[in-house]
Structure formats: C-alpha cells, structure tokens
Amino acid sequence: MRTSKKKKASLELFEKNKVYSLEEALEILEKMPKAKFEESVEVHIKTSIDPKKSDQQVRGAAVLPFGTGKTVKVAAFTETQQKEAQEAGADLVGGAELVEKISQNKELAFDVAVATPEMMPKLAKIAKILGPKGLMPNPKSQTVGAQIKPLVEGLKKGKVSFKNDDGGNIHQVVGRRSFSKEQLKENLDFFLEEIKKNKPAASKGKFILSMTLASTMSAGIKFK
C-alpha cells in the first residue's frame, strides 16, 4: 500500500472538519494503517500569540511521563563537571576542545546540547553552527545550568524543549505508534498542561485556538 493510499485510508476513518475529544482522536489514530517503519505521534497546536512580538513567545521544556520513544544523543559542554556528565549518560562530553573540534569539522553527532554557565562565552564560537539547528544551549529551554547531571538525566528520561514557530504554532513529538493509548494520553495531557503554564502574560484572550493529532504518515485529527 503506497503512502498516498494509506493517507486516503486514514481519512476514511474520521470527519476531517469535526473536532473530537482526545480519547476519540487516539482511538481513531490506533485504527489507522501503519507504515513499515516506527512512526512518531505528533501534536500540532495553533496559538493566538503574535509571534513577531518578543513578549509573546512560547518557550519551555517538559519531561514527558513516557518519553518520546526516541533515544536522544546528548552533548554536554562543561570544563568542571565532565565526570558527572559522563555518569549521567551524556554521549559527548567536553569543554573548549570539543568546541574547537566542532568549529573545525562542523559535525554534530548529537540531538541536543547542554552546558554549564562558564561554557557560554566559549560556545559563541560555534553559535552559527548550533543555532540554525536549534542546538544552542539556552537557559529558557533549560539546557544551561550550574549542575550538569540533572540536565543530562532529564533529557535521557524524555525531556523535550518546545517553542513556537514563525506562525505561532507549536509542534511536538509525544510518542510512537507502538505506545498504548494510555501512554499517549498521559504524555499529551502533561504536555498540554505545560503549554498552558507557558502562556505569555502579554497574550490576551483564548490562548490555544486548535489542536491536531497525527502520526508521521497519517492525516491530522482535530481534537480538544
């Protein structure tokens, strides 16, 4: 069955413009044809913020109860806590020498980076390499801290960072198709609460305008 056929088959399982409950959306998703690979389950949230205004940015982090199902490779930039970073499970650990290595070969064999504060001036050297890929450690995304161990451990347990895109939307992987409905619901409930907690004070009125649930290859299901 081709991808286009799978998407067509998934569309036959629900009404495109109907808004379902989260439980109903998860039941529909479970019935959809599966791809030959392990698909991610994603939530797409449309907010009412004005993304052009600096005081209306949505940004934060959350440790999903059941993680995302993905093994995350973590790079830890630190001069003083390298042993702690290694013990916490960091895949790549180093200080100035690691910064220099990345500046030379531009290879990024990791999914997320954390750092201790003393490394931030040194990381400026590779900011143009890390930044475009969303890998630059930042206090707002809770990837910079005085203690490196909890930063690494949180990411290994399923911590995710989120922020709005240029359209004021938030996109997040919340699990895999192999997860149970209960696991996906718990992850989603937790993530949505974190989004609500991070509503900008400058954003007035209804914050979340719409939400869509989908897997990598499926059509999107609107839910509330």
Could you tell me what each predicted segment is?
Residues 47, 78, 116, 174-176, ...:
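Flexible glycine-/small-residue-rich
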Residues 25, 85, 131, 213:
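Residue-level signature of catalytic and energy-coupling elements of molecular machines
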Residues 212-224:
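C-terminal edge-of-domain segments
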Residues 90-194:
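Long, charge-patterned amphipathic alpha-helical coiled-coil/hairpin "stalk" segments used as oligomerization
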Residues 37-41, 198-210:
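Flexible, glycine/charged-enriched surface loops at secondary-structure junctions
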Residues 23-82:
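Translation machinery proteins
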